């Protein structure tokens, strides 16, 4: 289906990377959109072409209600009153992913989930290129999808957040994957977790092949399941499964051994799961199995994802700053084997999530919890006997450096977004690395 944007009043919301990519997309088509940003001083303002009309400081602008088409950036809530009003007036509101999906003719692999998206998407990109594909990776990983549009592409791999899926309606994926679904971004969704979950599930709606995590109870009745192929991974009853009867878990397809985890660089059950689903995707795409295995054996952690920064004098320092929700902290804790104390750095903006699920884990572990940031005081009350509130990350690292002993593991796995003290999880992780080098 061909979309004609000429003659339409087009408005872009947000001057981040996504917003800039949308401007460039329309300009290439000979169309001049308008753009609004809530900030009075957006960091990308300098990138706005001089001939583009803009408004800063508020979304409550008449332009919204005068538009024919609004392209909304993922950082802006779809549930703002003025946007609800715009929908009621029949104004079309879409994401950059929707624009992208209208342009693409080659296969798309869509990857979403609460945790692990960037790791799996990067694995698949490497496997695809190893297999001879001209593959492009974009989306939530930091490269807007409109920037990777290429007439010569064989394959697109896109990482998708729930925010990006909210206003995406015609994404026809060759393969769609939900890695996992756990509580996150609850403050974004008026109807709570189920609304967040349903948004994630929408990735399957127009997919040919749906890969599902058997450990998550996904109601197939919520998905338009006509003419779909379903592939499962996770538990013993899955198509792709992990057998954990030995110290080194083994990955299977049906009853056939694929890979022993002792052969790979990555560590931790969550990483074994990432490798498992990557094998499922690769097989579904009919990539040569040997290419996939060779890539996965040599794959190392992406920055800020359970990244071992230092391992000296019997002390491990692990940077898991990408942990922005409670489930990812839980996974990180379950991946640590140590005879000493786990010294956990927890804190930031909890996004109204329920951290009480960590209570039982804290009780069973030899652990000291250093809570910092916006919700640090609240988090320190989850397990008061083992917790201490520290104002910021630097003070926490200084304190830990004085208390740490041989055999201990220091883990930055905040379980929260970085808002309040940092611009993003990368800035938080980089400061942690810098502090380790300076203080320890």
From Swiss-Prot:
GO molecular function: ATP binding; UDP-N-acetylmuramoylalanine-D-glutamate ligase activity
Group of enzyme by EC: ligase
Family recorded in the similarity comment: Belongs to the MurCDEF family.
Nucleotide-binding keyword on record: yes
Matches recorded under NCBIfam families: murD
Taxonomic source organism: Buchnera aphidicola subsp. Acyrthosiphon pisum (strain APS) (Acyrthosiphon pisum symbiotic bacterium)
Entry protein name: UDP-N-acetylmuramoylalanine--D-glutamate ligase
Keywords: ATP-binding, Cell cycle, Cell division, Cell shape, Cell wall biogenesis/degradation, Cytoplasm, Ligase, Nucleotide-binding, Peptidoglycan synthesis
Reaction(s) this enzyme catalyzes, per UniProt: UDP-N-acetyl-alpha-D-muramoyl-L-alanine + D-glutamate + ATP = UDP-N-acetyl-alpha-D-muramoyl-L-alanyl-D-glutamate + ADP + phosphate + H(+)
Gene Ontology terms: cellular component: cytoplasm
EC id: 6.3.2.9
Any GO BP: regulation of cell shape
Principal subcellular localization: cytoplasm
Gene assigned in the entry: murD
Cell compartments where the protein resides: Cytoplasm
Residues where ATP binds: 113-119
Function recorded in the entry: Cell wall formation. Catalyzes the addition of glutamate to the nucleotide precursor UDP-N-acetylmuramoyl-L-alanine (UMA).
Domain of life per record: Bacteria
Pathway note: Cell wall biogenesis; peptidoglycan biosynthesis
